[in-house]
């Protein structure tokens, strides 16, 4: 009897010790969701971001080549939407550093309270001499997202190395106390969890000082997600916020800060070594400098092009630093320009797009949202080369240091290519106008 008593006492004491600090697993709303990835400071650094609706006390990614034998940890921040309900969620970010180039990794995210499903991504090849493939679009909502299934299918077939979403998400991310934003991030997860999803802010992200955009996405910007750049293959990509020119209640200093940063970034991209390695410079932002739509006054507003009171206009920088292509959205349509500066066409030497004399502008804002596509003015402006109101998205390929290619996919026409463009350039430098 004494032996039985001692054994029972020992068992109880051991259980008490083991239970001290043990996980209770009582954590509702701790399942990871809204998973998406982006490039870090280098393209073999991948940032993985996701949400939970309770604090999991840890942010962990298990990953590897075929098997998940590695682990990385990060941090989580509490984001509270500015709406009436003040809904909150924990947004987790983990950085996977110094991955192997041109390698497929499998991963899942989570904590002791639960893991996501398994995803994979492929890091880009090292260096500049490889075929870069991208999907580009703007203005995609959680309703009427015509292009989403096509993009999901292409991503699953490994057609893209990067996705550029050129502003306006969900319509809007803050709607219904940010529930629409949550649903949109779930919808794009099949894309954004497998292909780096690079973004810029649009006018529909403005609410509460762009808080949903800034908190939900993790871009490699110097101070925030509002502007940044990254190098991929033979291309230097630059993302800017056109919205700092329109929502000045958040401070004119934002315009100055971005302008100064952009000038410095483009100057660095134009050093002989950098321009030799990555000759193509592509800038993207939400509101276009040029468009010919008739539904509102936006196409006649020139704040980003000429600046406020003639200061901090972005178009002269495009010329000074030889930006090759500028990509916009905002208008729910597709439009391609001839080489263009200050409303004047500067065609190339042997054809419009062979050694063009100015940047080419592309508007690709017809991915699909609850707002309809936007009609055009007639006749077309002299600088407008092609335009369409079909729902769709843009494919881009950078073949090498001299040739890049764009094509517009029409979802209305079941994936038919309705426009295509080769740009051939043998010397990348400031334009001589």
Describe the residue ranges of each PLM region:
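Periplasmic/luminal catalytic loop of GT-C fold multi-pass membrane glycosyltransferases
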Residues: 377
């Amino acid at each position: 009897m004494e032996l039985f008593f001692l054994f029972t006492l020992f068992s109880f004491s051991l259980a008490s010790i083991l239970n001290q600090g043990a996980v209770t697993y009582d954590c509702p709303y701790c399942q990871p969701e809204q998973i998406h990835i982006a490039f870090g400071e280098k393209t073999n650094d991948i940032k993985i971001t996701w949400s939970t609706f309770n604090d999991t006390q840890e942010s962990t990614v298990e990953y590897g080549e075929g098997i998940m034998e590695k682990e990385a940890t990060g941090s989580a921040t509490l984001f509270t939407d500015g709406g009436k309900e003040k809904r909150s969620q924990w947004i987790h970010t983990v950085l996977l550093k110094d991955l192997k180039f041109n390698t497929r990794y499998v991963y899942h995210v989570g904590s002791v309270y639960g893991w996501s499903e398994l995803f994979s991504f492929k890091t880009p090849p090292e260096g500049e001499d490889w075929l870069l493939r991208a999907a580009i679009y703007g203005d995609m909502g959680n309703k009427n997202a015509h292009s989403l299934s096509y993009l999901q299918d292409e991503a699953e077939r490994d057609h893209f190395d990067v996705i550029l979403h050129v502003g306006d998400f969900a319509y809007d991310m803050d709607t219904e106390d940010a529930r629409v934003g949550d649903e949109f991030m779930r919808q794009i997860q099949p894309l954004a969890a497998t292909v780096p999803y690079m973004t810029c802010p649009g006018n529909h992200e403005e609410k509460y000082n762009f808080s949903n955009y800034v908190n939900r996405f993790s871009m490699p910007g110097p101070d925030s997600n509002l502007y940044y750049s990254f190098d991929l293959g033979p291309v230097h990509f630059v993302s800017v916020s056109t919205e700092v020119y329109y929502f000045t209640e958040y401070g004119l200093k934002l315009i100055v800060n971005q302008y100064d940063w952009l000038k410095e970034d483009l100057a660095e991209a134009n050093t002989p070594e950098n321009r030799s390695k990555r000759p193509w410079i592509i800038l993207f932002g939400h509101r276009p400098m040029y468009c010919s739509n008739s539904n509102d006054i936006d196409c006649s507003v020139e704040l980003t092009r000429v600046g406020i009171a003639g200061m901090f206009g972005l178009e002269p920088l495009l010329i000074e630093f030889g930006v090759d292509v500028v990509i916009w959205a905002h208008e729910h349509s597709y439009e391609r320009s001839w080489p263009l500066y200050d409303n004047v066409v500067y065609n190339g030497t042997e054809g419009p797009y062979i050694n063009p004399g100015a940047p080419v502008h592309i508007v690709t804002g017809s991915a699909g949202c609850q707002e309809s596509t936007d009609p055009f003015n007639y006749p077309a402006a002299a600088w407008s080369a092609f335009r369409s109101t079909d729902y769709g998205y843009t494919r881009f390929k950078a073949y090498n240091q001299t040739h890049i290619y764009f094509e517009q996919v029409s979802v209305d026409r079941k994936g038919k290519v309705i426009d295509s463009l080769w740009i051939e350039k043998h010397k990348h430098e400031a334009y001589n106008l």
